[in-house]
Amino acid sequence: MYTSNEVAHAQQYEGANVSSESDIESHAILATAREAGEQAGLRYSGDVTPQEAWQLFSRQVALLIDVRTLEERKNVGYVPETPHVAWATGNPMERNPRFIRELESKADKLDVILLLCRSGKRSVAAAEAANKVGFKNVFNVVEGFEGEVVNDQGVTSGGWQSYNLPWVRD
């Protein structure tokens, strides 16, 4: 459960109307992430775990936007019903010059947005760029979709898939 301080903080988050236990929990996640982001000096709203991202997305509190390449989505998989706005494309990867314009077509600048990449690195750069142009509630999903590569064989640790969160592959 949450302390009265956490509940009060959640109820004040962005002036949200917080009434149910799930609302309180969702807004507490965002408030905690934002506070940690401010303390760390992040240039975006903050970080959330894959489990927190699923909770926020499945409760329709936030948009989950996949910033990986189209090839990654096709070959590795993706979270159903998530928009795709590639941060970078090509080989070697180059920043998508239309990223901000494409993001603006998917989300309002006041929406709560969770950005997901492979390991949580590209999504940080994408979150910083979005914040710079006025997106106020942009969060990075740490560990990303696949997690961090931990050895030469490509074994990963963490990530959306490792927590058995919903995903599909075409």
Q: Locations of the language-model features?
A:
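Short, surface-exposed ligand- or partner-binding patches at beta-edge/loop junctions that are enriched
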Residues: 115-116
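Conserved G/P- and acidic residue-centered "switch" motifs that form tight phosphate/ATP-binding loops
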Residues: 66, 120
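Rhodanese-like catalytic fold shared by cysteine-dependent sulfurtransferases
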Residues: 2-62, 70-112, 123-170
